[in-house]
C-alpha cells in the first residue's frame, strides 16, 4: 500500500466531536466581596490601606461572585515564602503543584470518562495542558497513572501555553481524532494559581489584578470522530480550529517563571487590542462556512477580564444574552486560564438542556470558541451544535 492510501485508510470519515465534558474545582471557595479582607490579613499587609482600597475596587469591578482556590489559609501558613511579594519561593510552589495539578485533572477526567460511557481502556490519546508548574515526566504521565490508562496511550504535554490554551488543546485533539481512525482523545486542562500567588506590593500593581481575577479548576473532554450510535452522545462537532498571533502585540500579556514564581504582565490596552482584531479573526474562520451574522452564533469567549468581554461584545454588536454562559462562568469561577472556555462549553450545553433548547448551542446551529493569551495569540474554534433529545 502506498503512503497516501495508508493515510486515507487510517483517517476518520467525519469531523472531530466532543463526546463528553467533565469539570472539577478545589473545595476551598472564596467570596469575592470578602476576599480583600482575607488577602491582606493572611499576607500580613493590613498596613497597606491605600493598596487594600485599590484591591477592593478591582475585586468589585471584576464581575466575579466567587472563586475556587487550592491554597487555603492552612497551606499558606505552612509556606510563608508564598506570602512575601518577591521572596525566593519556587521550590515550595513546585512541591505543591506537582501533586495538585494532576489530582485536580483526575477529578475532571473521571467525570468525563463516566459521561462518555465507554471503558477508559478505549482512550488512545491524551492531551494535557497546564501553565501550573513544570516537571519531567510531566502531569500527563501522572494523570495516566492516576486514571489507570494503558501505557500505550499517546501523550502530548502542553506546558505554559497561556490563557488561550483551552482552544489549543481542542485544536490538537481535533487533529489527532481526525487523522487516526477510531481514536478517542482525552483532552485535559488543569490550572492552579499556586505559582502566581503572592502578597501585595505598591511597586507591583499588575499582581493585584492576578490575585483578584484568577481561580483554580480543571476541565476534561473526550474527543473523537465517527461516534458510535447508541453508545456515544455527541455534544459539539469541531468544524475548524485555527490560531493567529497579532503583530506587534507580544508585550500586551505574558508571564515569566522565576525564582519568585510566575509573574504576569497585563497591559491596560489588552481589551482594546483584542477587540480591534477580533472581527478579522472571526471572518477568516467563519467565512468559509458562510457565517457572518454574529448574533446567530453561540459564544464561548475566554473571560480574561470583564473589560475584554465588554469590548468584544460592543465591537461585534452582540446582543446581551449571547455571552450569558461566558459571564456566568466568570462570575462563579473567575479566570481559570486554559480550563475556562471548556467550563463555558459545559455550562452552555447544560443550560441549553435546562431551558428546553433544541440544540446544545442555545438552540443555534453554529458557534465560536475564542481563546486569548500570550503572543498575543487568538485561538478560534468553530463549533456545530448537536440536537438535544
From Swiss-Prot:
Transmembrane segments: none annotated. Expressed in both the leaf and rhizome, with higher expression in the rhizome. Its EC number is 2.3.1.218. Optimum pH is 6.5-7.5. It is an enzyme of class 2 (transferase). Pathway: Secondary metabolite biosynthesis; flavonoid biosynthesis. One of its GO terms (biological process) is flavonoid biosynthetic process. Keywords: Acyltransferase, Flavonoid biosynthesis, Transferase. Pfam families: Chal_sti_synt_C (PF02797), Chal_sti_synt_N (PF00195). The active site is at residue 163. GO terms for molecular function: acyltransferase activity, transferring groups other than amino-acyl groups. Optimum temperature is 25-35 degrees Celsius. It catalyses: (E)-feruloyl-CoA + malonyl-CoA + H(+) = (E)-feruloylacetyl-CoA + CO2 + CoA; 4-coumaroyl-CoA + malonyl-CoA + H(+) = (4-coumaroyl)acetyl-CoA + CO2 + CoA. InterPro entries: Chalcone/stilbene_synt_C, Chalcone/stilbene_synt_N, Polyketide_synthase_type-III, Thiolase-like. Belongs to the thiolase-like superfamily. Chalcone/stilbene synthases family. Catalyzes the formation of feruloyldiketide-CoA by condensing feruloyl-CoA and malonyl-CoA in the curcuminoid biosynthesis. Has no activity with cinnamoyl-CoA. Homodimer. This is Phenylpropanoylacetyl-CoA synthase. It comes from Curcuma longa (Turmeric).
